[in-house]
Amino acid sequence: MSSAATKATFCIQNGPSFEGISFGANKSVAGETVFTTSLVGYPESMTDPSYRGQILVFTQPLIGNYGVPSGEARDEYNLLKYFESPHIHVVGIVVAEYAYQYSHWTAVESLAQWCQREGVAAITGVDTRELVQYLREQGSSLGRITLADHDPVPYVNPMKTNLVAQVTTKKPFHVSALPGKAKANVALIDCGVKENIIRCLVKRGANVTVFPYDYRIQDVASEFDGIFLSNGPGNPELCQATISNVRELLNNPVYDCIPIFGICLGHQLLALASGASTHKLKYGNRAHNIPAMDLTTGQCHITSQNHGYAVDPETLPKDQWKPYFVNLNDKSNEGMIHLQRPIFSTQFHPEAKGGPLDTAILFDKFFDNIEKYQLQSQAKSSISLKVTYSTDKSRLQSINVTKLAKERVLF
């Protein structure tokens, strides 16, 4: 540690404050304070768009010991190899002890260097056990990190902002399955999608066309074999455009048989579009080891989770939906499944990276539904590269998806 280390303070609004040392960007920040008990995967967590606007507390006592891998490395699908999106989405991180010395064969820089380059505040030396105990008892709280030579910034509640609009792709983009492996065309509504979700789709043979969160999917659904609703940040009730579009899709009898799969925020938006309600959890569920029971089989699965809101299962229309999974820790809803149609969703992340892969089979279930839909539609075996989409939401035009961007469009 440098002898010129900058002192910093982490404060909870109307709560405790903690002294520490800054190892991130030279800035003070504010946001909603949440914690994760995940032992590994801090690069994936920090680049997960679901953490947008939040200060993330790590309960793992030593953070940064394996450095940070390349944010430029891509896999055979042209997806980011190590990150869940191109940039960090948390505004700050809080750790008990930062590992100034790091070692890993994939590392290209330290966690401190990465935070400084990305403009993310970071503080070490905080009693995270005491802090997390407070958050568990009082609930997720507004917090701020203030550097010693800075004036405190005002507390900010990001849950009052439509965070999805900040993280969604700005234009459609397309990710293809490997040559000769394509089985289906899937439309993905990007509310803050993680790279590994797209990977789980394309590696199973999907040509994935990703649309902005407010895109009128109901206008183009007939061009696809399945619809996917992604994860994302913030209060689901602020995504009214998505809710309205999904509701219109659900209410159109033309699409009665089209498969739909939602994860995390996508699960909540699907529930809201169906007439159910959501509520904010006291401190949320953010970990890689949360047990969820499949109510259709009685089996328990260990799941990866990152959410601060949940669906109220009692408000689901009982003639259409039933709960699919339940959290065995706090009994909150973890999924729902349609009684007549090939539609289901989960609150947890079956694509987990990092985390357990117990429920990755749900992607296979989605593709089983797609195969049945294709047979019902007498789909041809060849996969068309033609899709129809609206560039101005009022005029439809047919284009070749090979002309779309091949990665998310940030600006």
From Swiss-Prot:
InterPro entries for this protein: CarbamoylP_synth_ssu, CarbamoylP_synth_ssu_N, CarbP_synth_ssu_N_sf, Class_I_gatase-like, CPSase_GATase1, GATASE
Domain of life: Eukaryota
Chain sites annotated for binding L-glutamine: S50, G232, G234, L265, Q268, N306, G308, Y309
EC number: 6.3.5.5
Main localization category: cytoplasm
Pathway connected to this protein: Amino-acid biosynthesis; L-arginine biosynthesis; carbamoyl phosphate from bicarbonate: step 1/1
Alphabetical GO biological process terms: 'de novo' pyrimidine nucleobase biosynthetic process; glutamine metabolic process; L-arginine biosynthetic process; pyrimidine nucleotide biosynthetic process
Enzyme class, first EC level, given as a word: ligase
Keywords: Amino-acid biosynthesis, Arginine biosynthesis, ATP-binding, Cytoplasm, Ligase, Nucleotide-binding
Result of altering H307D: Abolishes glutamine-dependent CPSase activity
Molecular function GO labels: ATP binding; carbamoyl-phosphate synthase (glutamine-hydrolyzing) activity; glutaminase activity
CC terms in the record's Gene Ontology section: carbamoyl-phosphate synthase complex; cytoplasm; cytoplasmic stress granule
Catalysed reaction equations from the record: hydrogencarbonate + L-glutamine + 2 ATP + H2O = carbamoyl phosphate + L-glutamate + 2 ADP + phosphate + 2 H(+)
Entries under SUPFAM superfamilies matching the protein: Carbamoyl phosphate synthetase, small subunit N-terminal domain, Class I glutamine amidotransferase-like
Upregulation: Repressed by arginine.
Entry annotated with the keyword Cytoplasm: yes
pH-dependent activity: Optimum pH is 8.0.
Effect of H349D: Abolishes glutamine-dependent CPSase activity
UniProt function note: Small subunit of the arginine-specific carbamoyl phosphate synthase (CPSase). CPSase catalyzes the formation of carbamoyl phosphate from the ammonia moiety of glutamine, carbonate, and phosphate donated by ATP, constituting the first step of 2 biosynthetic pathways, one leading to arginine and/or urea and the other to pyrimidine nucleotides. The small subunit (glutamine amidotransferase) binds and cleaves glutamine to supply the large subunit with the substrate ammonia.
Note: In S.cerevisiae, this enzyme is synthesized by two pathway-specific (arginine and pyrimidine) genes under separate control. One is linked to the arginine pathway and is designated CPSase A (CPA1-CPA2), it is repressed by arginine. A second one, CPSase P, is part of a multifunctional protein (URA3) encoding 3 enzymatic activities of the pyrimidine pathway (GATase, CPSase, and ATCase); it is feedback inhibited and repressed by pyrimidines.
Record text on subunit structure and interactions: Heterodimer composed of 2 chains; the small (or glutamine) chain promotes the hydrolysis of glutamine to ammonia, which is used by the large (or ammonia) chain to synthesize carbamoyl phosphate.
Protein name per UniProt: Carbamoyl phosphate synthase arginine-specific small chain
